[in-house]
Amino acid sequence: TRTEISCHARGSYHFFPRAHSLVDIGGQDSKVIKVDDRGNRIAFKMNRKCAAGTGAFLEEIANRLKVKVGRLNELAEKATKDISIGSYCTVFTATEILTKIRENVDLKDIVRGIYQSVIQRIMEMDTLEGEVVMTGGVAAHNPFLVRMFEEKIGRKIFVPPLPQFTGAFGAALYALEAKGG
């Protein structure tokens, strides 16, 4: 039996065999996975029980801002200021955002601040060593968040094709290997 974690590692290794750190930001959780030179999982850390820093978090924030979740990337790209969104809880973040709106902070800057908050949460989970791969729906639908992350760590982050399916692809590779393919 293969775990979700090992399947993400296998799928990522197929595309980026030199990567040693994987960041997966999905709908319900986010994780940092460390792999060895053969793509085997050696360690992983997962976000807290709170949804903050996940795709569900971004959907909730989009609802609170009364924008479609698909517009978040476009808004963040057009931001002109860096603002801090510091809360670690979706409920508290929503309250913090309402305060920013009342203070007439531009919506674009708020969304950029939310992206920075997601990145900060990931970086607090574990160090990112060597080449870094990002998978999950957040990477698929928020390419500007990936670029912001690259700026934060000072190096390129590799994103596989259809990153939201990397774990499923890894599972398929394991199944193929088990059949002798």
Regions found by a protein language model. Name each.
Residues E4-I5, E150-F169:
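Conserved phosphate-binding/catalytic loops in two-lobed NTP-binding clefts
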Residues M123-K152, P163-Q164:
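Glycine-rich phosphate-binding loops at beta-strand->alpha-helix junctions
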Residues T1-I5, S21-I25, A43-F44, R71, ...:
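General beta-strand structural signal in soluble alpha/beta enzymes
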Residues T1-G26, K31-N40, M123, G170-E177:
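Conserved phosphate-binding catalytic cores of ATP/NTP-utilizing and phosphoryl-transfer enzymes
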Residues G55-L58, P160-G181:
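Glycine-rich phosphate-binding/hydrolytic loop that grips phosphoryl groups
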